[in-house]
Structures are given as C-alpha cells and as structure tokens.
Swiss-Prot record:
Reactions catalysed: L-phenylalanine = (E)-cinnamate + NH4(+)
Primary location: cytoplasm
Gene Ontology annotations for the cellular component aspect, listed alphabetically: cytoplasm
Enzyme Commission code: 4.3.1.24
Induction entry: Induced when grown in presence of ammonium nitrate, L-phenylalanine, L-tryptophan and L-tyrosine.
This protein's name: Phenylalanine ammonia-lyase
Length: 724
C-alpha cells in the first residue's frame, strides 16, 4: 500500500509539473515575464552577459532603452575565454594552419599567410563594402527616399547586435581576448553606435559586412562613422569612429589573430533584428486578442464563441485554447457581449443571424496557430542569442579547432518567415473585423462608417476602411518567403545561405504595417462602443417616450395590460427598424421608425372592435414620437460629442477591455469623432477636431514607443490565471 501511494503521489507531481510547464509555455506568460524583465532593466537593473542567459527582453532593453550592460564576473566564464584564446595563440606560434588565422576567407581559403595581424585588416577591408550616405549635408536635389533611413540601420538594431555578439564571444569558443569583448561593451556604455549599411548581408557566413563596421569602429578606422551624442533622439551627430573614441577616451583595438573573424563571423545582426521583431510580435498577438474581445463587444457578439467546451474539450490545440481563454476572460462583465445563447423558437429569431460571423466566431481557431508559430520563433531566436555562431570554433579544454558552419542563420530565417506569415494572418483577422464594424449591413445597428451625426454629411470611417485594405494587402505581399530567393554567392563557396537579416528586416516592416492597421482598428472600436452607449441612452429615452404617448393618446381605448403589451411591441419594432435604417439622417430615420408602427396600431384598434378615435390619433401618435425622438437623438449627439457625458461614456458597458478604451480616450486624449460634422463644419476643418489620421497616429506611436505594452501587460496581469 505505501508503495502504491508513493506512485500515486509521483503521478500527481508529474501531472502538476506538466500543467505548470504548459502554463508557462503560453504566449501570454512569455509576454508578461518578458515585460516584467524589461521593466526591471528600464528601472536600473544591469544586464549580465554570461553567454547562456541572454533574453529577448535584455536585448530590447540594451538596444532601445540604453540599459546598463556588464560582463559576467564569473572566473569560470573568463577562464573559458582565456583558454580558447591561448589555443589560437599557440597555433599561431606553432605555425599551424587554421582557417581565418593563416588562410584566406571563404572560396579563397586556399591562400596562406604568416601575417595573421595583417590578415585581420584584409578581412575588414573587403567587407567594408556597404552603401551609406557620404555626408549628412543638405542635398541639392530632393531624394526619392530619406538618405539615412534608406541605406543605414536604425541604432537599436546595431546596439542589439553588439550585445548579442558579446554574448556569443564570452562563451569561450571563438579564440578572442577578454579585452576585445570589454571594448564592445565600452561602445555600448558610451552610446557610440556604428553607422551600419542596411543591406549587403546574406547571413550565410554570418552577417559579415554589418559586423565589419563594428570591428572598424573598435579599431578607430577614420572612414568608419558612428552616431555619437547624448541620446537616440537628442543631438546625435555622425562623426568618424576615431574622433568618437578619442572624445570618450576609449583606446582603439589592434585586432589579434582571428579576432577580426571572431567579430565578423556571426549571426548577431540577424538575431538582434529578430529579437526586436519578436518582442513586438508577441505584444501585437496579445493586443489582437484584446481587439477581438473589444470587437465582440462593439458588434454585440456572443462570448459563446470562446466557450471552454469548444476549445479545451473538443479541439485542444494549445494556441487555440490560449486565445479563447484570454478572450473569454476579457469579456467577463461586459454588458455589450451576450453571455450565453438563449434557446428560442423558430419564429422568435426568424431572419436574424443565429451566430457571429467568422471573424469573431472562429478567431481562436485563426489566432491559435499564429500564437504557436510565434512561440516556436521565440524559442529559436532565444537559443540563437545564446549560441556560438562563428567559424572556426575553439575547444579550450582539448585544444581542438573545429571547422563548421554555425554561422548559417537558417534558424533565424525560419523563425522570421513564420513570424511574418503570422503577422499577416493577424492583420487579415483585424481587417475582417474592422470592415464588418463600419458596414451597416453587418454591424448590428451601428451607423455607416461609424458616423456620430447624420450620415449624409459624415463618412467618418470610410477612409480608414480603405486604408486598412491597403495595409492588409501590403502585409500579404510582405508575407511572401524571402528564403526562396537564395542565390549562390562568394565564388560558389556560399552556394546556400539563409538571408536571415533580409527576412528579419522584412518582418520589422511587416510589424510596422500591422501596428498601423491595429491602431486604425482600435480607433474605430472606441468610436463604435461610444455609439453603442449613445444608442442605449437613446433606447431608454425612446422607450419612455413611447410609453408616455401610448398612455396620453390611447388610455381611453385600452386597459393597462393592453397598453403595456402595445408599448412592448412598439418598442421592439422601434429597435428592429432603427437597426435597419442606420443609413438615414435622424429626421428621416425617426419618420421611418414611426411609419413602421402604423400596421401594428391599425391591427390593434381593428382586431376586436373598431375604435375610430384611436385610429384617428395614429398620425398624431407617430408625429409626436418622431419629433420627440429626433430631438432626443440630437441632444444626445450633442452631449456625447461635446464631452458632456465624460471622456469615456462607454466604460460601464465594457468588460475587462475597459482599460484599453480608457487609455485611448483619457491618456491619449482621443475624443469621440463627429463634432465638426454635427456643426456642419461651422469652423471649417481641423479646428474643432484633429484629423482622423492624427488620432490614429497617436495610437500608433503609443504602440511603437512601448506605452501600450504597459497597458496590455497590466490588463492581462489582472485576469484570473487559466486552469487549463
């Protein structure tokens, strides 16, 4: 018996371990852990470079937020570097033939030299072949593209690459001196960023050319330029690397044997850009789930699409479960999304859509595979950041030199290809939800283009709808694989290569387009839920108006019970007709609504007995309601658009998506759109309201600059943990 109990305990422990592993494997947990880590670096925590524990959060912190970086103080780590260096020094002393130490490079490896230090200069010289602006002076002709952006890498990419290269070299497999790694860190600390060509790497023997500009900076090559100055968005200036090192009292490096190859022959740039891309992709994948939940509310959809039975029991793909669980939790407490599907008779829901359309109903199934692909990419790129990716590799313990191909960055390429395709699919889903939201034939009673005033002079969301089509089309183009375009290079020595940096660059572009698309959708979502709030207030008022007019004109003809029944029937007809007439201006819409009352009223007053006085009162009844409802609608529009109802009139209707809505409305100060239209453009354009694009740009910048990361992280931190 004791042994059986012991086995049962072990089984339970194994099960709990498995479940814990699954929980921590979700993209949400990866995002939250990474966000906490990044926040700690931004608050002063130091990044420790030890060759094994570098995270994407650390890469992002060093690359984008100038976080402090220090080399590991472990004696064992330093000893590993020194032992590998000693192997190379001994090989040189003995005159042993070692690739890149006594031989030429690539297809020219059949040449030999006994001048290893000169060989390092020859290596850098032939790799300094990228195209960069010759100066930052004003040009005599307007260029077709920004000269710097079109030819040089953003500083964040370069800083991230330097950190990753340090982390690779410190692993002790590259045969470089400890001082060389320290010098790279000196550049980071001084905020000296080499100006690196955007193009020229095929990421086969690593990112040779880009890394050569880092090496050129370390050696104070006067022809290699750097960005120097107090901050990335301050008075940065482009100066010679020699001048920058002198200004910061950093002594230039004279590269020892193999050290040129040690810097150049690695995947650091590909890994850096991929790391930064995946940090954003993870956030946008979570934000897409928030958008879908908010979209479910804006379209008055049902939470039933995210019910656990569908996803956990019936089709338990991990990504699908995660997406459904997150959206289910986000919608708890919502007064706009229906909590359950009520069973009704055939006649009760006749001519009504029985279920949400695919963009909402199948969103967990659509997003789930993207989540799984991004998770796989995160694992691959994290591993790459903690790998040795140059050639040859040195085993400091045995003295053996290994000639291999760890510089072949196909792991990064594959990660980026699947990430970029996932980005497109996320964008396609957001676009499909967005275009449904602005279409009055599909949006469950919202006005066309989400107009908050008469639609004859308000086409608010139409331009956004067109723009999002452009964005998703570009995403589709960018989703095409890069790796199918590999060309044989360098004397056919590099007959296969990875194009990882090109793929990573394309992924960053794709993420930027998705950010613009999602910013547009978020903007429309906030407008939509405000319109839902306005409509609810209108419904309450019209219901009271109908009750008052029924009592005033028909109390002599009907009993109290009959009046209640008539009132209820008329209100239902009002709601149905309002939903079907949203393309009309308010006056015409209310006339159409009350016209729909006539058949019902005639039937009531002729079905049992003819009531001439009641029949004669029908025109007045319709006129009174039409007039009063139109006036109420106008007052509500005025109060919402003026801000009289507060900045966030829809907050009380939302579930846990409320914080995103309030961030946009309050923190970013983006108001409900339509005041210019309501006043018939009395003050012209751009006076009462900024442009639609300016508002969307504010959301885009908040996502781009990381502010939205905090909002999304805080939102999900507050959600109950999944029990799987």
């Amino acid at each position: 018996m004791p042994s059986e109990l012991f086995d049962l305990d072990n089984a339970r422990a194994a099960r709990d371990t498995f479940l814990d592993a699954r929980r921590t494997a979700t993209l949400l947990h990866k995002f939250l852990d990474s966000h906490r880590e990044l926040k700690s670096y931004k608050n002063g925590r130091t990044i420790n470079v030890d060759g094994h524990t570098l995270s994407l959060a650390a890469v992002t912190a060093a690359a984008r937020y100038n976080a402090n970086v220090e080399l590991s103080q472990s004696a064992q780590v330093k000893e590993g570097v020194e032992k590998s260096r000693a192997v190379i020094a001994e090989k040189v002393e003995q005159g042993t033939s070692v690739y890149g130490v006594s031989t030429g490079f690539g297809g020219s490896a059949d040449t030999r030299t006994d001048q290893p230090l000169k060989l390092q200069q020859a290596l850098l010289q032939h790799q300094h072949a990228g195209v960069l602006p010759s100066s930052s002076k004003t040009l005599g002709v307007l260029p077709l593209m920004d000269p710097m952006a079109a030819t040089s890498m953003p500083e964040a990419w370069v800083r991230g690459a330097m950190l990753i290269r340090m982390n690779s070299l410190i692993r002790g497999h590259s045969g470089v001196r400890w001082e060389l790694i320290e010098k790279i860190n000196d550049l980071l600390r001084a905020n000296i960023t080499p100006v690196v060509p955007l193009r020229s790497s095929i990421s086969a023997s690593g990112d040779l050319s880009p890394l050569s500009y880092v090496a050129g900076t370390l050696t104070a090559n006067p022809s290699i330029r750097v960005f120097d100055g107090p901050s990335a968005f301050g008075a940065r200036k482009m100066v010679s690397s020699r001048d920058a090192l002198a200004a910061h009292k950093i002594k230039p490096v004279t590269l020892a044997s193999k050290e040129g190859l040690g810097i150049l022959n690695g995947t650091a740039f590909s890994a850096a850009v991929a790391s930064l891309a995946l940090t954003e992709a993870t956030h946008l994948a979570l934000l897409a789930q928030v958008c879908t939940a908010l979209g479910t509310e804006a379209l008055c959809g049902t939470t039933g699409s995210y019910a656990p039975f569908i996803h956990v029991t019936a089709r338990p793909h991990p990504g699908q479960i995660e997406a459904a669980n997150n959206m289910w939790n986000l919608l708890q407490g919502s007064k706009l999304a229906s909590g359950h599907e009520e069973e009704v008779s055939i006649n009760q829901d006749k001519y009504e859509l029985r279920q949400d359309r695919y963009p909402l109903r199948t969103s967990p199934q659509f997003l789930g595979p993207q989540i799984e692909d991004i998770l796989a990419a995160l694992a691959s790129v994290t591993q790459e950041c903690n790998s040795t990716t140059d050639n040859p590799l040195v085993d400091g313990n045995t003295g053996e030199v290994h000639h291999g191909g760890n510089f072949q960055a196909m792991a990064i390429s594959n990660a980026m290809e699947k990430t970029r395709l996932a980005v497109h699919h996320i964008g396609k889903l957001m676009f499909s939800q967005s275009t449904e939201l602005v279409n009055p034939a599909m949006n469950h009673g919202l006005p066309p283009s989400l107009a908050a005033s008469d639609p004859s002079l308000n086409y608010h969301g139409k331009g956004v709808d067109i723009a999002t089509a452009a964005y998703v089309s570009e995403l589709g183009y960018l989703a095409n694989p890069v790796t199918t375009h590999i060309q044989s290079a360098e004397m056919h020595n590099q007959a296969v290569n990875s194009l990882a940096l090109i793929s990573a660059r394309a992924t960053v572009t794709s993420l930027d387009v998705l950010t613009i698309l999602m910013s547009s959708y978020l903007y429309l979502l906030c407008q939509a839920v405000d319109l839902r709030a306005l409509r609810r207030d209108l419904d309450v008022g019209v219901r009271a108006i109908i009750a008052e007019e029924v009592s005033k004109l028909f109390s002599n003809n009907l009993s109290s019970e009959e009046m209640d029944l008539l009132h209820s029937s008329l209100y239902s007809k009002y709601q149905h007709t309002m939903d079907k007439t949203t393309t009309m201006d308010a006056v015409d819409q209310m006339k159409e609504v009350t016209a729909s009352f006539a058949p019902m009223l005639v039937e009531v007053f002729t079905s049992t007995r003819v009531m001439p006085d009641a029949l004669s009162a029908i025109p007045r009844f319709r006129s009174n309601i039409s007039s009063r409802a139109t006036q109420l609608f106008d007052r509500l529009r005025a109060s919402y658009l003026s801000g009289e109802r507060g900045a966030t009139p829809a907050s009380s209707l939302l579930g846990r998506t409320r914080s995103v809505y309030e961030f946009i409305r309050v923190s970013l100060g983006i108001r409900m759109h339509g005041s210019e239209n309501y006043s018939a453009f009395a003050n012209g354009l751009g006076v009462d309201d900024p442009t639609i694009g300016q508002n969307i740009s504010s959301i885009y910048e908040a996502i781009r600059d990381g502010k939205f990361h905090d909002v999304v992280a805080d939102l999900f931190e507050a959600l109950p943990r999944s029990k799987l």
